[in-house]
Design a protein with these regions (language model features):
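Often metal-dependent polyanion-binding catalytic scaffolds in large enzymes
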Residues: 1-278, 284
Length: 284
């Protein structure tokens, strides 16, 4: 148990174009998984199976007729964009599932739950930071890639928060939330909307800057992981105080674990300058 609590796993996403699957194909693979799951669910319903088999055939036909690789050399910005798509299409949902599965194993075998702040996995990347191997990677490219990463994170958090806000229609809440929102039949929704709105502002401001070169007002953006976690902790404490531990350990806990893992940038960026370092060493 203590070994698991102290795990520290660093995973680095490469920017090499030969290791990047086309997002179109990744989405097709997800569709096939969904169809296969539905086929198992409706195995005793011939009419439904016929429809699912047609969908499966269509998806496979499209995949067979789709090129695995893009035939145009990608820019460093494109490489980063494709890499971030992996987070949205796979890692964003996979990370909390892994933690939840691991927690189930410990709960079953050791009668202990993992700490609520359990977060052994961190993602790193040198997409947009490869100053050693790619002469097209400049300081401006790195800056844009980091902004793109923040844009991606804000978009994902906004979507997750919107889902929770729609779900949390409960009226009973803690005094801390009540003092913040005043009299409300939907205190959790009122309390979480400012955070969701700030995600939306962050997402749209960065998009306007990257597309139309509009200046960014950093004061209006989400600037730290703690800005996400603090209100979520207050909501979790309120739910636990009102005998709603099962709700607190559901989508809210998943979102908190995502926030701990990904922060405001889904990956931490490393600048590779090994070639310049070796040259400097030889000169000395």
């Amino acid at each position: 148990y203590n070994t698991a609590k102290n795990l520290n796993i660093g995973i680095v996403l490469t920017a090499h174009p030969t290791e990047v699957k086309r997002r179109t194909l990744i989405q097709k693979y997800h569709s096939i998984i969904e169809i296969l799951e539905q086929r198992n669910l409706f195995k005793n319903f011939p009419a439904k199976l016929k429809i699912l088999n047609k969908r499966l055939f269509d998806e496979l036909t499209i995949i067979w007729n789709t090129d695995d690789l893009k035939r145009v050399k990608p820019s460093p910005y494109d490489e980063a964009r494709w890499g971030l798509a992996i987070i949205e299409d796979s890692l964003w949902d996979t990370v909390p599932k892994v933690y939840r599965r691991l927690n189930s194993i410990f709960a079953q075998n050791m009668k202990k739950n993992l700490p609520k702040n359990f977060n052994p996995i961190e993602f790193g990347s040198w997409m947009g930071g490869d100053r050693d191997g790619n002469p097209n990677v400049t300081a401006d490219v790195t800056r844009k890639v980091i902004l793109l990463s923040r844009w991606e994170a804000a978009k994902l958090y906004e979507k997750a928060l919107t889902k929770i806000i729609r779900s949390y229609s409960m009226e009973k809440c803690s005094k801390k939330i009540q003092n913040k929102v005043g009299k409300s039949f939907e205190p959790y929704r009122v309390f979480l909307r400012p955070l969701r709105d700030k995600m939306r502002v962050t997402h749209r401001s960065i998009e306007q800057h990257l597309v139309y070169k509009k200046p960014i007002d950093q004061k209006k953006l989400l600037n730290s992981r703690e800005e996400i976690l603090k209100p979520l902790r207050i909501v979790r404490e309120s739910l636990e105080q009102n005998q709603n531990e099962n709700i607190a350990s559901g989508e809210l806990l998943d979102l908190m674990r995502r926030a701990k893992c990904f922060g405001i940038n889904p990956v931490s960026y490393t600048h590779l300058r090994a070639h310049e370092t070796r040259e400097d060493l030889v000169c000395r």
